[in-house]
Amino acid sequence: MALITERVPERWEQLEELVTAILHECGMMARRKVSLALPRGSVDVDVLAEETSDRIVQRIICECKNWRTNIPREVVHAFRTVMQETGAHRGYIISKVGFQPGAVEAARATNIELVTFIEFQNIYFDKWINNRILVART
């Protein structure tokens, strides 16, 4: 499994910073601590990334949980609401250690992926390396 960084985030801020940096290095506009409007107020998201291809904008939201325990289903339920009400296309809940079985079930058949930080890096590795090659050629 190829890693983009060998850094292991010790604090939640570091996890958010690393996730933002990876998405940015993949060619996306990525920002931390973004407030998004909802039909009934607003919500703060850990990381928001947007990628435009052929004038179509894809929105990705990441919820970063640097907890020492597995993430429970209630976190997934709350994140599903955020995903639905913001119109995001893809969501990631990124965990330090993993997820409770109820969380995995709650994410099934949704546009949310439950991943560890290492799995997140693996998902974006090819895009990251291809973008670095593209940038080096220009």
Label each region the model flagged.
Residues 1-138:
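Mixed-charge (Asp/Glu-Lys/Arg
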